[in-house]
A protein has these predicted regions:
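Residue-level recognition of conserved beta-strand positions in structured domain cores
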Residues: 42, 63, 89, 99, ...
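Short beta-edge strand/loop motif at the mouth of beta-sheet-based domains
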Residues: 16-17, 35-71, 82-84, 141-152
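Hydrophobic/aromatic beta-strand elements that line small-molecule binding cavities or substrate pockets
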Residues: 19, 72-78, 94-101
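A short, structured loop/turn motif at beta-sheet edges
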Residues: 25-26, 77-82, 99-107
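Terminal "cap-and-tail" regions of soluble proteins that handle hydrophobic small molecules
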Residues: 2-8, 103-175
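Hydrophobic ligand-binding cavity/cleft-lining segments
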Residues: 1-45, 169-175
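Hydrophobic pocket/interface hotspot
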Residues: 28, 38, 59, 76, ...
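Glycine-centered tight beta-turn/hairpin loop motif at sheet-sheet or coil-to-beta transitions
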Residues: 12, 67-69, 90-92
Length: 175
């Protein structure tokens, strides 16, 4: 069963993932906003201008050079601690994190509004990232299996899916 769903009702498709986390929203907020905590699960470093998640703040996303030589930039679109964080991710994507109290924990909803051909790739990647955030083990070939499942699910609705860039050096390298 796939974890991510595809929403095609907006101006661009979006992949949406939900995860139940055992910690309260204030703790999860720190995990999605504090640089040292992001390093444990996010796919790259996250540097926020001035160190504060405020609307309009610039963000830099340098990837580890051993994975891919690339740096994305972004801008904070919304920040309502500990409920909502949204920002641009490069030139073509918008990430949105919604935190909902659920019992003693939090329901985290991650939406990635993106280019249609990137939906399966990003769904597989975000699922792996959220597994890390939740403290779950990640198998070495999990990304490829998830990508194949999401490609089969998404292609009939939004067309062919692209794997990672050719210059990607990580485990999920393209065929």
């Amino acid at each position: 069963m796939t974890d991510a769903t595809l929403d095609t009702t907006g101006p661009k498709p979006a992949v949406r993932l939900e995860r139940r986390l055992p910690d309260p929203p204030a703790v999860v907020w720190r995990a999605i906003t504090e640089r040292d905590q992001l390093k444990a699960w996010f796919p790259c470093d996250v540097i926020v201008e001035g160190g504060r998640w405020e609307v309009g703040a610039a963000i830099t996303f340098p990837f580890p050079p051993e994975v891919i030589e690339m740096t994305l930039t972004g801008t904070v679109l919304a920040a309502d601690e500990p409920k909502l964080l949204s920002y641009t991710w490069g030139e073509e994507e918008i990430l949105r994190f919604e935190l909902y109290p659920e019992g003693d924990g939090t329901r985290l909803v991650l939406s990635d509004q993106l280019r249609a051909g990137w939906a399966a790739r990003n769904a597989a990647g975000w699922e792996e990232c959220l597994d890390r955030l939740a403290g779950l083990p990640v198998e070495p070939d999990a990304w490829r299996r998830r990508f194949d499942v999401y490609s089969a699910a998404f292609e009939p609705r939004i067309g062919p899916q692209q794997g990672p860039p050719a210059e990607y050096k990580g485990e999920a390298s393209a065929d």
